[in-house]
Structure formats: structure tokens, C-alpha cells
Amino acid sequence: VAQREGGAIVILKFFWKFLYIVVNEKTMMNLIIDEGNSSIKIALFEENRCKIFKKIENETVLAQFLQEFSLGELKAAVVASVVKDAEQRFSFLNNILPEVLYLNALSPMPFVNKYATPQTLGIDRLALAAAGVHHFPNCNVLIIDAGTCITFDVVTKNKEYLGGAIAPGIGMRLRAMHEFTSKLPLIEEQDYDNEEFIGNTTQSCMLSGVYCNVVQEIEGVIGLYKQRFQDLEVILTGGNHFYLQKRIKSRIFASSLVLVEGLNAILEYQKQL
């Protein structure tokens, strides 16, 4: 009897240990860090789903935010930064996470990089390409990021990143007209909802010339890529994607999470290497 009771206790202990591992495995999350020049975007992914997405000021705020989570809830982190000394400034992550990945242009990616100068390729464009492969793994994909610049990046159905194009963004175009002329005013980016494309004031002419023309430009670029690549899927993201997605007539997938989704896809890919 004693032996049977002892065996039952061992089995019960094993069961609870197994249950603890299973539960914790399901709740463990990836920490995604995208550091730009003026702010840091962070996201938490659980089983490839974004659970939290927010913008913070600096790494000190990040450290405070991470105190809300218990040991074991976070399993890995990826850091993509355009600022120097990222590994030094985020070194505290090594004390609370078993795996921290710092990305650079030569890091392994879930696609073949055909770019002629890979060392000059921004981490953001690599992450967008990875997101394209993640969302449409067997398709030709054009990823458009409408931010400070408007970038166009294409990944083939064979998972080959070819490159794309870089154009001035909306804010850059508005500032350029002011800075390179003597009389045109400085106009800030705004939610331009005027459907009338013929401006009747200098300001409305400038706004129409930027906002309406950007829509037509993107439509034209999509058309060019569709001529080259059959069954093309189009992803739109970036700070201005909310305005653009309502006006672009081509079928697109639009989301503000594309870049962090790409970073999470890269992290998951490198775990398997």
C-alpha cells in the first residue's frame, strides 16, 4: 500500500510539473523592440499574436514597464535600433530574458536577400519583408510603408527579397515646398479629408498636390508591380496608412503592426536555426 501511495505521489508531482510547464509555455511571450530616433515602439507577442503594442520614450520607461511581468512570462526579445550603442543601453534585458537578439543588416532572415548592397539596407525594410513572407508565404508581396519616407519592398513567392523604391513621405514633401521656395507656407501633416482635388487657396493647392498625388503615385506603383508579378499581394503600413487605405482602390491588406510582426517573425525564424 505504501509503495502504491508513494507511486501515486510521484505521478501526481510529475503531473503538476507537466501542467506547470504547459501553462507557462502557453503564456510565455516575445518582446519586440523597435527603436527609432525619437521614440521606441514595443510589442508583446504570444503565439504570433500581438497582445500589447505601445510607444514609449526611452529604455528607462521600458525597464519600468517590464517590472509588471513575472519571471518566465517573457521568453525572448528582439531589438531593432537605428541608434548607436543599442546593445549597451538594452543590456539589462540579458538579466531578465534567456534570449536577446540584436538585429543588423546581415542577420539571418526568413528569405533570401538579393539586395546588391545588403550592408546599407535598413532593419525596418528587412522586417517589412519578413512580415510579407509571414502573411503571404507562397505569394509575391509588395509592402508599402508610408512613413517619413514611403518605401516599396517586394518579396517573391520563392521568398527572395529583391529591393524596391524609396520616395519622400507626406511630411517631407510639405516641408520641401516651404524650404525650397520663398513664399510657400509651412504646412504640417494633417487628416486631409477634402475630396475636392482642385485647390482654391495656396494651402489647399499644396495639400492637394501632396495628399492626392501620393495616392495616385502609390496606385501607379502597385500597377507597375502587378505587371511584373502575377497574383501580387499588397501590404500597407506606416504612420500615414490610415489616410491612404481609405483612398487606395487597389485591394490591400492594411495594418499598423506590420513592422513589429516582421520583427517577431525574424525572432521565431532565428530560434529554429
Residue ranges of each PLM-predicted region?
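Short beta-strand-loop/turn "lid" adjacent to the catalytic site in phosphate-handling enzymes
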Residues: 71-122, 156-170, 200-211, 215, ...
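N-terminal amphipathic/basic-hydrophobic helices that include classical n-h-c signal peptides
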Residues: 1-27
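Short, structured loop/turn "capping" segments at alpha-beta junctions
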Residues: 139-144, 162, 183-192
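Active-site rim beta-loop-alpha module in soluble metabolic enzymes
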Residues: 167-228
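Gly/Thr-rich phosphate-binding beta-strand-loop-beta motif of the actin/hexokinase/Hsp70
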Residues: 28-47, 132, 138-161, 177
